[in-house]
Design a protein with these regions (language model features):
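Catalytic domains that recognize anionic headgroups
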Residues: 1-132
Length: 132
């Protein structure tokens, strides 16, 4: 998508700068729509909702580390201590939420991000976690 939600056809052979621009344009549009939905959920829910907003991957550019950087945002009403930490990965998001809201006892798993290439989909590589 373009920044206003318009359909965009990307040319074949786009370089990293072109992918970054296309990714930024998509994010601008998605941010606008996501905020509308989140405001609606919070404003019309009879009970404060738990909201998790996650991306499955970052920008699809040649820098593999960018591919592993995702959005991981939470709205967790009523909790004084969430247990969230800067290096959390999605594998532990729901475990913490179930433990905090529903009395679960799910142990946390290793926070790891795996990547594979299209031509070798089952050859996984562990990505370094560069979260601050």
């Amino acid at each position: 998508f373009g920044p206003e939600g318009e359909w965009v056809v990307l040319p074949v052979g786009l370089d990293d700068a072109g992918w970054r621009k296309a990714h930024t344009d998509e994010i601008q549009y998605v941010n606008t729509r996501a905020l509308e939905v989140i405001r609606e959920l919070i404003g019309t829910s009879a009970r404060e909702p738990v909201i998790i907003l996650q991306a499955d991957h970052g920008a699809m550019i040649s820098d593999q580390q960018n591919h592993a950087e995702i959005l991981n945002a939470y709205y967790l009403p009523g909790l004084i201590e969430t247990g969230l930490y800067p290096t959390i990965t999605p594998v532990n998001s729901f475990r913490l939420i179930f433990n905090n809201y529903f009395g679960g006892t799910y142990p946390l798993l290793e926070d790891a991000t795996y990547m594979s290439y299209y031509d070798q989909p089952f050859e996984f590589k562990i990505m370094e976690n560069n979260c601050p």
